[in-house]
């Protein structure tokens, strides 16, 4: 047992037959340092603990024994005097609270012995339940009388499962110690215990009827007795563990109590008799409430432990548990359930309102004054301001009583003493039921039970802490609550506090705080609402507002669904960030298509603006901008059309004196394949068209030819523009610098989209138009039809009365070529084209590209002045110094006059096609101009890139989350800047709803190793257009597994890119029909069934999908799991054969059913969908 003369706590507790907590508490009181039950203490300390425990237990047992003997033999007055003496010693309450009350093992056996000595021998149940204890009064003041005794008969409460045994003893009289004047009571009578508890109860009730007094006295008596009855198990007198078992048949019963003093409360027990037993503690009751366990009373009063019920409440033996909570800490809920204590009214004139700081209307004690320093209640009773709060209850204002703190361990022990003996029954269930029935039948007629409780009383919203509620038990055990429901508003919600029950951890009790503190852990008997009335009402209102929800009407449901569908549709539609208007007007349908809206939305918007429009009605630019801005989409005029306008006049005022005639610049425009380049070849007598890739022009060709007119040689400068739709910007640049526009229209094809575009460009540049109707030699050519179509575009031929020159020509057979040139010269002479060749050159960059040998190369058209080799010029934001110039034939020239196209070398970087250039006298001036332009150009380029990449973030994220958005990264390198622009413009026209094309880099020039590294890092595909690979680029591409695609024709390039975008799309599943069969017989097989079928068309395949139709209605859709023919499993059965069909999930076949077989196949999606 010992190690180095030491002993462990748990060994000492085992020797003393105590719990570890008792030893720990004793060690704490003796200031012995211990931490847990496994701590070691010296033998000397162990001896001290044993002496302390034995001393306390002997004192408690001795005090209980003496009080029982005195109650039997002495006069009440003598009892009072002795009680006062006992209570005058202040050491007793402290020892009781801190030493005696927490010793559970010491409380069990002595209690049984005392009980056996005081119990009638007629009852054979173990642990007879009745003892008599004399509660002696206490003097609260020197000037107060010291009389009053009360003797009650209480059953043993050791059996928690049979709480109804409490009902067999009705209280005779109960009063509490008070400073009021008192009168002497009759002597205590010794009576024999009744043979059974029911008869005893009847005798007690008969005595009550004979000695009935007013209702106030009864309420006090019943409340006091209720307190004693609930706490009687804690107040059985103790004896030493070695004392013999004393048996005695007689019991002590209280003498008839005088009813004249209804408010005298003398149940102040002798401190020596208040020894706790294994269940609950007995405590002197204070009128209207109970003290906290283990907390001393006010000055001069006894130590009130575990007070019983308030006066005015019925005797709560076996009453149902409190609704919404458990009993006091450590005390298990009552089981079985006693009579339903409905209607027991509160003290006269006052409903017991839970949570109120004091009870109004309770009368003062007659013939006496209240306790010292306590003012009277408004109704005559004492105002309980001096009492400290109960643990966890709302703080009562004005509390001034001094209470002694109690350690958490002691408070826990007081509250859980009932748990140790809950399995020792005293009364059997049969006897319990008999006693309950007897008690219910023999209740005193003057019992204060309310016979008509409010049937509509609403239960407060309290939840039970324990789910062990017995059936048949009621939810109310306090008549004051029913009274409050009848007289007040519906009961407010109580504060949500934790009610400690029998299953709660003891650590919770230990940490529940000391007395005088506000703690959130309460015993059920002390629970009170914390909030005031106004706060409860406020907290209750929001819950009422959300209880009922209006039912949605049909119209609201339809409206909500329509809004959801519209929102879903809007989410899928990706509106453009901006729209570009290529022409002056658009129809309503065209505008709706550009805005990704329904035409009805556009019409509705116009209607609200006072404009009535139809789908085919054209809208001007101002109206288009208004409608588009309403939907949050800005409108930009076609940049191409703006580029076609001549923004700078090349002729200045200083040039007027030196002006001479200059050759006209003629731009040939028209739809693709209408013969523009062939017409120029006929004029130049060359074969350019045959040498172009794909037979189409993809660059601006600048040529100067000489033509003899009226025996004079005239120079003409021609610009050949691409006719493909991708080269709109090129056509616009050609129109910007032109003097005369030649519109080529095929006689067999008529006006096409690019034809109309060329007309708009020419009109934007305000240049005259000469129409060349080509291919008149072809079959089916109709020049008149072309004239008719052009007249619809306000181009009326001269022979039709208009002012537009139209010449039918044949480029292949060179018919009417001279007439066309004459008409061009006539028109140019009318324009009076002049320039100053003596000034510094000014002009426009027609085309530019990066040559791997020559570097940046630009095709320049001099419009005024003379350009010489060595000149310093600024083309937009690019600085250059002319190193060399060559003409269209490749011949090197030193200077170029007005209207002369040349290729110039010597630029710092590739200039932008369409920029205007100007020669400066020195490089310093040129650099200053270029610096300013470069800053502006960078800002503009950045804005354009952000605008082009700006995709709606909401739609982008939505599509990415749905897995619908795919990206195709490209790096674009082309031979010239114009080709880069054309390709980028074409890529912008591709659908981007599900696949987004990202061009990470686009520039003219050859493909370099830097491009390969970028493509490898970003997972991009390199697109090369009419360009080559730099040295080492091919090897780097192979090493990094980079895909390089080279193209010479823009058609093929765009087709491949579109195919790659479609390859990123998920394929569609399309249903493909296989065949149809008819059910002609059914066969039951096990739990399922087989359908005998005849194949009417197509075939049936095993594991294919099928639908079963009955009377043209689909009754099943699933898979064909079994397919047999002549008891053999087959993969498929063709038309005209019979077979057996089985489905695992369908067996209700019927003759005449039609089986439709189908399967799903994948279909490649296109971007058009």
Swiss-Prot record:
Residues 695-699 are annotated as: G2. One of its GO terms (cellular component) is cytosol. One of the essential components for the initiation of protein synthesis. Protects formylmethionyl-tRNA from spontaneous hydrolysis and promotes its binding to the 30S ribosomal subunits. Also involved in the hydrolysis of GTP during the formation of the 70S ribosomal complex. Residues 670-677 are annotated as: G1. It is found in: Cytoplasm. Residues 71-83, 92-102, 157-171, 472-486 have a biased composition (Basic and acidic residues). GO terms for molecular function: GTP binding; GTPase activity; translation initiation factor activity. Residues 544-560 have a biased composition (Basic residues). Keywords: Cytoplasm, GTP-binding, Initiation factor, Nucleotide-binding, Protein biosynthesis. InterPro entries: EF-G-like_DII, IF2_II, IF2_N, P-loop_NTPase, Small_GTP-bd, T_Tr_GTP-bd_dom, TF_IF2_bacterial-like, TIF_IF2. This is Translation initiation factor IF-2. GTP binds at residues 670-677, 720-724, 774-777. NCBIfam families: IF-2, small_GTP. Residues 774-777 are annotated as: G4. Residues 139-156, 231-248, 282-294, 412-432, 439-455 have a biased composition (Polar residues). Residues 69-108, 139-568 are annotated as: Disordered. Residues 720-723 are annotated as: G3. Belongs to the TRAFAC class translation factor GTPase superfamily. Classic translation factor GTPase family. IF-2 subfamily.
């Amino acid at each position: 047992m010992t190690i180095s003369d030491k002993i462990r706590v748990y060994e000492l507790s085992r020797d003393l037959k105590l719990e570890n907590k008792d030893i720990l508490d004793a060690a704490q009181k003796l200031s012995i340092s211990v931490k847990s039950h496994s701590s070691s203490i010296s033998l000397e300390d162990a001896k001290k603990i044993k002496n302390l425990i034995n001393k306390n237990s002997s004192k408690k047992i001795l005090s209980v024994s003496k009080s029982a003997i005195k109650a039997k033999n002495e006069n009440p007055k003598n009892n009072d005097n002795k009680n006062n003496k006992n209570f005058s010693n202040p050491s007793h309450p402290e020892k009781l609270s801190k030493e005696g009350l927490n010793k559970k093992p010491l409380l069990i056996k002595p209690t049984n012995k005392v009980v056996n000595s005081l119990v009638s021998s007629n009852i054979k149940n173990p642990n007879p339940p009745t003892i008599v204890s004399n509660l002696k009064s206490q003097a609260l003041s020197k000037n107060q009388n010291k009389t009053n005794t009360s003797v009650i008969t209480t059953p043993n409460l050791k059996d928690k499962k049979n709480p109804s045994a409490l009902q067999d003893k009705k209280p005779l009289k109960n009063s509490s110690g008070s400073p009021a004047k008192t009168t002497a009571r009759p002597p205590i009578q010794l009576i024999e215990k009744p043979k059974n508890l029911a008869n005893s109860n009847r005798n007690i009730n008969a005595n009550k009827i004979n000695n009935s007094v007013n209702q106030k006295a009864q309420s006090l008596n019943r409340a006091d007795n209720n307190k004693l009855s609930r706490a009687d198990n804690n107040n059985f007198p103790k004896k030493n563990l070695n004392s013999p078992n004393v048996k005695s048949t007689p019991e002590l019963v209280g003498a008839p109590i005088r009813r004249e003093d209804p408010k005298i409360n003398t149940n102040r027990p002798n401190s020596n008799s208040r020894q706790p037993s294994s269940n609950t503690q007995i405590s002197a009751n204070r009128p209207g409430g109970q003290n906290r366990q283990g907390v001393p009373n006010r000055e001069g009063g006894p130590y009130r432990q575990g007070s019983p019920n308030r006066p005015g409440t019925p005797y709560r033996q076996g009453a149902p548990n409190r609704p919404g909570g458990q009993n006091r800490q450590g005390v298990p809920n009552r089981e079985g359930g006693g009579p339903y204590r409905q209607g027991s009214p509160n003290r006269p004139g006052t409903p017991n309102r839970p949570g109120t700081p004091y009870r109004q209307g309770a009368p003062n004690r007659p013939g006496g004054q209240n306790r010292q320093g306590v003012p009277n209640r408004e109704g005559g009773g004492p105002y309980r301001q001096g009492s400290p709060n109960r643990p966890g209850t709302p703080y009562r204002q004005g509390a001034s009583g001094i209470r002694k703190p109690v350690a958490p361990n002691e408070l826990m022990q007081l509250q859980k003493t009932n748990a140790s003996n809950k399995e020792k029954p005293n009364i059997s269930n049969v006897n319990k039921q008999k006693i309950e029935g007897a008690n219910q039948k023999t209740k005193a007629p003057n019992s204060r039970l309310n016979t008509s409780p409010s049937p509509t009383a609403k239960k407060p919203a309290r939840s039970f802490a324990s789910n062990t509620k017995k059936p048949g038990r009621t939810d109310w055990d306090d008549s004051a609550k029913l009274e409050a429901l009848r007289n007040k508003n519906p009961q407010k919600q109580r504060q949500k506090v934790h009610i400690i029950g029998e299953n709660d951890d003891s650590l919770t009790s230990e940490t529940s705080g000391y007395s005088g503190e506000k703690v959130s852990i309460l015993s059920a008997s002390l629970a009170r609402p914390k909030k005031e009335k106004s706060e409860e009402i406020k907290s209750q209102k929001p819950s009422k507002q959300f209880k009922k929800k209006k039912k949605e009407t049909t119209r609201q449901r339809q409206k909500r669904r329509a809004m959801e569908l519209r929102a879903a549709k809007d989410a899928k539609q990706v509106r453009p960030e901006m729209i570009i208007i290529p022409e002056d007007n658009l129809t309503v349908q065209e505008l709706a298509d550009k805005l990704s809206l329904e035409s009805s939305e556009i019409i509705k918007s116009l209607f609200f603006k006072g404009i009535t429009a139809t789908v085919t009605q054209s809208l001007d630019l101002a109206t288009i901008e208004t409608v588009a801005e309403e939907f949050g989409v800005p409108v930009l005029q076609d940049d191409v059309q703006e580029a076609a306008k001549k923004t700078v006049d090349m002729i200045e005022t200083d040039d007027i004196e030196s002006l001479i005639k200059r050759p006209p610049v003629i731009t040939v425009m028209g739809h693709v394949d209408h013969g523009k380049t062939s017409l120029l070849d006929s004029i130049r007598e060359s074969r350019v068209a045959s040498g172009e890739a794909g037979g189409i022009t993809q660059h601006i060709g600048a040529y100067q030819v000489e033509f003899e007119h009226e025996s004079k040689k005239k120079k003409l400068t021609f610009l050949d523009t691409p006719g493909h739709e991708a080269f709109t910007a090129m056509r616009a640049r050609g129109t910007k610098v032109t003097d005369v526009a030649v519109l080529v229209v095929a006689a067999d094809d008529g006006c096409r989209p690019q034809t109309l575009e060329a007309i708009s460009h020419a009109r934007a540049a305000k240049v005259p138009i000469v129409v060349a109707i080509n291919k008149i030699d072809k079959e089916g050519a109709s020049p008149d039809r072309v004239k008719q179509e052009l007249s619809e575009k306000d181009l009326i031929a001269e022979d039709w009365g208009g002012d537009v020159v139209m010449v039918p020509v044949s480029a292949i057979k060179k018919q009417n070529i001279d007439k066309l040139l004459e008409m061009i010269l006539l028109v140019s002479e009318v324009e009076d084209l002049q320039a100053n060749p003596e000034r510094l050159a000014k002009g426009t960059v027609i085309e530019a590209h990066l040559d791997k040998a020559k570097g940046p190369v630009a095709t320049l058209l001099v419009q005024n002045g003379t350009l010489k080799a060595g000149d310093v010029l600024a083309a937009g934001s690019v600085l250059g110094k002319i190193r060399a110039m060559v003409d269209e034939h490749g011949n090197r020239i030193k200077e170029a006059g007005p209207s002369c196209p040349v290729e110039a070398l010597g630029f710092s970087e590739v200039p932008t096609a369409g920029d205007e250039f100007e020669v400066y006298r020195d490089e310093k001036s040129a650099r200053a101009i270029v610096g300013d332009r470069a800053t502006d150009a960078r800002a503009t380029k950045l804005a354009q890139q952000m605008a082009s990449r700006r995709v709606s973030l909401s739609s982008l994220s939505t599509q990415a989350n749905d897995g619908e958005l795919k990206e195709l990264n490209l790096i674009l390198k082309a031979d010239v800047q114009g080709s880069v622009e054309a390709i980028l413009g074409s890529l912008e026209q591709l659908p981007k709803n599900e696949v987004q094309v990202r061009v990470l880099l686009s520039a003219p020039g050859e493909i370099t190793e830097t491009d390969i590294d970028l493509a490898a890092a970003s997972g991009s595909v390199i697109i090369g257009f009419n360009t080559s690979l730099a040295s080492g680029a091919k090897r780097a591409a192979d090493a990094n597994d980079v895909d390089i695609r080279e193209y010479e024709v823009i058609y093929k390039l765009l087709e491949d890119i579109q195919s790659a975008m479609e390859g990123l799309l998920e394929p569609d599943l399309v249903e493909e029909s296989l065949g149809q069969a008819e059910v002609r017989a059914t066969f039951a097989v096990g739990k399922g069934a087989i359908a005998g079928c005849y194949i009417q068309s197509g075939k049936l395949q095993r594991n294919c999908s099928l639908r079963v139709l009955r009377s043209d209605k689909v009754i099943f859709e699933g898979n064909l799991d079994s397919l047999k023919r002549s008891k053999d499993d087959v993969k498929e059965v063709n038309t005209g054969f019979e077979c057996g069909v089985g489905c695992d999930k369908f067996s209700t076949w019927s003759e005449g059913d039609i089986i439709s077989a189908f399967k799903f196949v994948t279909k490649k999606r296109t971007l058009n969908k």
